[in-house]
Amino acid sequence: MTLGRREFLQRLGLALAALGMADATLAGLGNTYQQALARSSRRLALLVGINQYPAAIWQQKAPSEKGAFLQGALMDVELQRELLIHRFGVLPTDIVTLVNKQATGRGIVEAIQGHLADQAQPGDTIIFHFSGLGSQVHLTGRSASEHLPTLVPADGTLPRDEGDTIHDLFEETLAQILGSLQGVRVVTILDASGAAPRTSPLQGNFRVRSRLTIPTGTWQAAPGISLPVPQTPADDLSRSWPGLLLRASKPGMPALEGNWHGFSAGVFTYALTQQIWNSFPSQRQSWIFQRAAYKMETWSGAVVSPELRGELASKDKSDLLNTGGIPKPAADGFVKTIDAANRNAFLWLGGLSASLLPYCALGLRLQPLPALPGLAAVPQGTLIVKGLRGLTAKAELLGAESLSEGTPLVEIERRLPRDIDLCVALDPTLERIERVDATSALAGLSEITTTAPGEQQADCLFGPLAAVDQPSGESPAIDINQTDADQPENYAASQSGTAGIPLGYGLFSPNHTLLPGTAPEEGEAVKTAVGRLTPLLHELLAVKMLHLTTNSMSSQLPVRFSLETMESPGQLVLIEETLRSRQFAKTKTVQLSQPISDANQPKFQIQLLNLGQQPLYYLLISVLEKSRLFVYCPFVEPASSTEKIAEVVAHTSQLKPGSRLKVPMQTDNGLPWQRLQATELFAIACTQPFYETWKAIRTPEFRQSSDQLASIPDPLAMAKAVFEDLHRASQGKNTVSSPQELLVTLRSDAWATLLMRSPIIQRKVV
């Protein structure tokens, strides 16, 4: 039986505790620190990352042929090391790293013995991280369907015939070695996979951390270690793994590696470490890891399958809290080094939203936080980013004598171009003439750029499709105001043609999942397809721009966004809130008394709460199936002109201090759970009305929908207007922005954008 998403998130929450991130409320932080400081437990970490594999190791081709090597495994090691040292307080001397040629099979085993086993004392925590290639292997003489999971070391040669030895590190061998350590807590993170055989190392715009083939050979014990021959399948092995096991994907599914601005990293490792940086000590572990999984889904464009397994995964999390970790404030990064004489500093921005990285050098501003919240004064000063390399930024220090190394930092101002580009990767299966035509056609569109797959971060892919292509795991096309009973027939039923016969071209998510509504009804030329898909490209760009405004961690406005059932009594399903809101209402996320299932399908209501002392103006926007945008528009009396109506709506969309907005109000209009599975919900609150935004929405084509969300006629114009309104609010009430200005400036004290994704649905496993 596969692990359900809800169970995964519950189990995954335990991992944060095992790494030292215990639950604590702000009021109880003092006791938490005292208890943590009194503990003597130690954490020892071994971090392994391999980018440089000879081609002969992972594909059955001549060694002279160029292979598609990994690019992000070493970055994973850096991400984990910075997190362990500066978030959890692990001593640098307690962390050993093995990279590339150092990470031979023997080298890994000897490091486990020398650094972990020989030094660990009862009560300590052992952390083993591996980023690189994984594999499935078949041992000679075993059943043809019996495949065992392995990790591929730097010297893990690929057998040429069935009599050759497989020199991989078998996962079962690793589990047996780690399980032999007595009295310690073991946390294993594997950002590698033994995916099913494939013909390409790429999946959409991502690299797959797996061998392309399943080799057959014999097993040989590591020198000096007496262990039985591996025989346990991956699922059974995961269940009995010592301590906790965090996998980037289910066994047999691909672990992905992607490109971001100036660096590559494992999707799982980057999402996990970034979310831990963004999480406050009082937030629930399940909340933290739910959002790490959401980050993975946002980047890949489809449902992901990370797992948390192991012997301790099903035990009470209280067994894992005594780890010696000191909670620290949520942060976008920290000060790595400081040059007080030249007023410069180098920063680590491991917690900053990945979507903001390309724009950091435009003048991102950060301010320091106290290292221990509530126990130290807030340091003074502002840091302005001048350049970025990977996640290390060079910044200018303003308004402070100096800052100490390790000082946490949080964003206070971001600057973005008025004109944001949508990056489209061209599918590698396109023929040369098709690529030329696609490049030419897309170049004729404003605000659209193209790239080859796997070379840089892309927002979507353009490529050919056949009748067998369909949105994996997606619902059929849904009307935002449609009830469950009114859903149209399955999306695949609308596809014409015979399986395998090209139908034309479509748009895909970054992991190559077909986007709903992009398949043609009949064959077409490339330029025809680009013309047909242009409106959808603009809608995707609008969604990208909305994502660029999200700031739940850094916003200084106390706002809470929730999803509740409409049945009486209502139950809270999900909460998104700015961290500032927790200073005003210290409540914990409430879970449903019963999981939502196929047989239990309540209607839902959105609620937005202003916890501050000043009135705020709001926008509620939903994105259905990644590109169809809808907005909640309060009812107003007809006015003399469209512009006048927009002005009235802008003033009417106000949340007074302490007030709550509920949408929809009537149960009959409640949001069905099926629709929410394909929906993102944005709540944007601002200190000034959204004049320009409502002008862009309330055009003659707009159709008011009472107590429901209504379709936005021109989503891209709306998104650009949101930028303008937030920029104006950040400048002050009497400031008039000029369209000639190339940048918009958004200050964290002027707005908050909260993003909520679909609730977790527990489906019956058969």
Summary of predicted features, one role per range:
Residues 27-30, 42, 105-203, 288:
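Caspase-like (clan CD) cysteine peptidase catalytic core
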